[in-house]
Amino acid sequence: MKKWQFVGTTALGATLLLGACGGGNGGSGNSDLKGEAKGDGSSTVAPIVEKLNEKWAQDHSDAKISAGQAGTGAGFQKFIAGDIDFADASRPIKDEEKQKLQDKNIKYKEFKIAQDGVTVAVNKENDFVDELDKQQLKAIYSGKAKTWKDVNSKWPDKKINAVSPNSSHGTYDFFENEVMNKEDIKAEKNADTNAIVSSVTKNKEGIGYFGYNFYVQNKDKLKEVKIKDENGKATEPTKKTIQDNSYALSRPLFIYVNEKALKDNKVMSEFIKFVLEDKGKAAEEGGYVAAPEKTYKSQLDDLKAFIDKNQKSDDKKSDDKKSEDKK
């Protein structure tokens, strides 16, 4: 029997701690591995970590992984402050975040754990919006297109109700870079992705964007919009188009890990090893898309090399100390 325990709640999100009562296969699992690794960040990545946690806890009842959902930006703030061991992110780390980590002498490793497609959706009753290009999306979310007729002269002269994640989310940053060219998003903003979905389902003129799995979970209530690429080809988000990047709003999902935690916290290093060995299966089970298998293999090889290198360094320091003591 598994038990989810909420260990903290804020306006930005909740932290989940997964424990297990008894091993998943009737055994106690790896009883030698004890401790905790703490993370926070993307609400898009959090469900993948939770799914991985379920599998992990079956054999690691005393090794806890906590995963918050404060948003990518907020997660990086905690990562920079040294409050957490890992940060979940739905976008690559920004240059200014890298600089802040460097200023604090914090080194990190980046792991790509899955792929996603930011999905644009409208109300189920919308019978005219089937596809959009990035310029049309930009017009909608910059506020320049106030009605559907402003987007396409053949569409109704009805006010658009555009909703967006707020700036604490990596999805917001991704959309800002890929669609808005860093022009301000002028739309109703919400920290809760489920609230964005709800807004679109309740408003006939609604439009919103979020991670692919949120669309999959609510596809009976939403209508996805195909996105045109630079050649004008309209493509819908599917596991195939997201993985091969033919969908115009495809993106990788990450876990960033403090190198010190990888070296000093066996729970952290073993969990990341477990994540990579899973090869995206947990992501697929949660409605996301696995990265190509070679991505997991190369990262796993790099992780093992990093751990081995540091183990040899620690062994050498231990041997040197013993030699000094003998003198």
From Swiss-Prot:
It is found in: Cell membrane. A lipid is attached at residue 21 (N-palmitoyl cysteine). Keywords: Cell membrane, Lipoprotein, Membrane, Palmitate, Phosphate transport, Signal, Transport. One of its GO terms (cellular component) is plasma membrane. It is a lipid-anchor. It comes from the Bacteria. GO terms for biological process: phosphate ion transport. GO terms for molecular function: phosphate ion binding. It holds the Pfam family PBP_like_2. Residues 307-327 are annotated as: Disordered. InterPro entries: PBP_domain, Phos-bd, Phosphate_ABC_transporter. The keyword Cell membrane applies. Residues 1-20 form the signal peptide. A lipid is attached at residue 21 (S-diacylglycerol cysteine). Part of the ABC transporter complex PstSACB involved in phosphate import. The complex is composed of two ATP-binding proteins (PstB), two transmembrane proteins (PstC and PstA) and a solute-binding protein (PstS). Belongs to the PstS family. This is Phosphate-binding protein PstS. It comes from Staphylococcus aureus (strain MRSA252). The lineage of its organism: Bacteria, Bacillati, Bacillota, Bacilli, Bacillales.
